[in-house]
Design a protein with these regions (language model features):
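Short, contiguous, pocket-lining structural segments
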Residues: 4-6, 33-41, 58-62, 66, ...
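Structural signature of PLP-dependent enzymes
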Residues: 48-71, 147
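Conserved C-terminal alpha-helix-loop-beta "cap" of PLP-dependent enzymes
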Residues: 69, 74-159
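Hydrophobic residues within well-ordered, non-membrane alpha-helices that form the packing/core
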Residues: 29, 49-52, 74, 155
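Short beta-alpha connecting loops at secondary-structure transitions
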Residues: 26-32, 55-56
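Active-site PLP attachment segment
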Residues: 1-25, 34-42
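Short, flexible helix-coil linker/hinge segments at the edges of structured domains or between repeats
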Residues: 10, 17-23, 27-29, 77-88
Length: 159
């Protein structure tokens, strides 16, 4: 919930289906969960749940539109590859979370972790992670077009 739904970090919901043994889940929760839950975290979950119940479709359409815009702009810079739905082939890739903006960076001569560090240290932009050849930025309901523009501009300058 905190990544995509707008609740505070460290908050989460556990959703179970009919095939999950409720007693076993309760046993594991009792081993790992505190008896003094944070009312701040629980309140943030409730507010986020309410917001998504009332406006979730609209909100996620806006996030998806921002992500697609970012993907197009990053690919237009040159040297980066922000991949998307074109990877879905029905054999090995069946779907794609468009809110996760994964960008290949090696063609600009920098490893993903280097771009990650530059974004953080020089542009004050914190993304999810960088590895040997990619960075991952996760767009959520808390992001605005302004943040997307900052990311795209920073990547253009880094190139």
């Amino acid at each position: 919930m905190h990544k995509s739904g707008g609740s505070l970090t460290q908050s989460s919901l556990l959703l179970t289906g009919p095939d999950v043994h409720a007693g076993y889940v309760r046993q594991i929760i009792n081993l790992t969960q505190t008896t003094s839950g944070s009312y701040l975290l629980m309140s943030s979950l409730d507010i986020s749940r309410r917001n998504l119940a009332q406006r979730g479709r609209q909100i996620f359409h806006q996030v998806a539109d921002m992500a697609e815009y970012a993907r197009e702009e990053i690919n237009a810079i040159g040297g980066y590859y922000a991949f998307g739905k074109e990877l879905v082939n029905g054999n090995s890739v069946f779907d794609f979370d468009i809110t996760k903006l994964s960008v290949h960076t090696l063609d600009i001569g920098l490893a993903g972790i280097e771009v990650y560090d530059i974004l953080r240290d020089e542009y004050d932009i914190q993304i999810e992670f960088g590895d040997i050849g990619n960075i991952l930025a996760y767009l959520s309901i808390g992001d605005r077009a302004q943040e997307v523009e900052r990311l795209v501009s920073a990547l253009a300058e880094i190139r």
